[in-house]
């Protein structure tokens, strides 16, 4: 009988230990799942941080190029103005003009390598996203809202507007006002 009681006590102790072990296993599995979840979150956050850092570096690079390019645009404007106001027939300025033409060509080629392109909209429809209207002029020969004259070229850097083109836009001629005789 003492053996039965002893075996029963051992059996109860083993059952209690098994229940404790089951609870402990479940607790450890929950901790493992939480640790895996935390690990995935940390990995995702690290990946997002790397992506954000790369985007910031790209933006900084583009911004630096944008500022530099903006600072160069007046130089291009000056070279183009020099060519526009010099005569190709004048022997005194012929060599200087050729030098300015070559300098401007090299400058434009360099800007193309860095995806800086000119917007010269002469004759095209007015686009408020790329053009800045400086004046409106009546003209019956072209469509209304067409660019008649370009005061200053615009520029795009990597497809993004760096400087709008300053333009004169056409408008339809106004209907003639009736004279006093026509009103009567």
Swiss-Prot record:
Assembly notes: Homodimer.
Protein name: Protein GrpE
GO term, biological process aspect, one: protein folding
Organism listed in the record: Pseudomonas putida (strain GB-1)
GO cellular component, one term: cytosol
Chief location category: cytoplasm
Compartments reported by the entry: Cytoplasm
Signal peptide bounds: none
Keyword hit for Membrane: no
GO molecular function: adenyl-nucleotide exchange factor activity; protein homodimerization activity; protein-folding chaperone binding; unfolded protein binding
NCBIfam families for this protein: PRK14139.1 (NF010737), PRK14140.1 (NF010738), PRK14150.1 (NF010748), PRK14151.1 (NF010749)
Family statement: Belongs to the GrpE family.
Primary role: Participates actively in the response to hyperosmotic and heat shock by preventing the aggregation of stress-denatured proteins, in association with DnaK and GrpE. It is the nucleotide exchange factor for DnaK and may function as a thermosensor. Unfolded proteins bind initially to DnaJ; upon interaction with the DnaJ-bound protein, DnaK hydrolyzes its bound ATP, resulting in the formation of a stable complex. GrpE releases ADP from DnaK; ATP binding to DnaK triggers the release of the substrate protein, thus completing the reaction cycle.
Ribonucleoprotein recorded as keyword: no
InterPro entries linked to this entry: GrpE, GrpE_coiled_coil, GrpE_head
Keywords, sorted A to Z: Chaperone, Cytoplasm, Stress response
């Amino acid at each position: 009988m003492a053996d039965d009681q002893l075996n029963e006590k051992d059996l109860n102790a083993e059952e209690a230990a098994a229940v404790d072990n089951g609870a402990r296993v479940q607790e450890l599995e929950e901790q493992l799942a939480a640790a895996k979840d935390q690990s995935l979150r940390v990995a995702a956050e690290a990946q997002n941080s790397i992506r954000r850092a790369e985007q910031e570096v790209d933006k900084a690079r583009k911004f630096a190029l944008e500022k530099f390019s903006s600072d160069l645009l007046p130089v291009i404007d000056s070279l183009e103005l020099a060519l526009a106001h010099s005569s190709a027939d004048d022997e005194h300025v012929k060599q200087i003009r050729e030098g300015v033409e070559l300098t401007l060509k090299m400058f434009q080629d360099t800007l193309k390598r860095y995806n800086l392109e000119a917007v010269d909209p002469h004759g095209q429809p007015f686009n408020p996203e790329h053009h800045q209207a400086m004046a409106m002029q009546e003209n019956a020969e072209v469509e209304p809202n067409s660019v008649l004259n370009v005061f200053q070229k615009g520029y795009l850097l990597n497809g993004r507007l760096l400087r709008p083109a300053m333009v004169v836009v056409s408008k339809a001629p106004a209907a003639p006002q009736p004279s006093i005789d026509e009103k009567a």
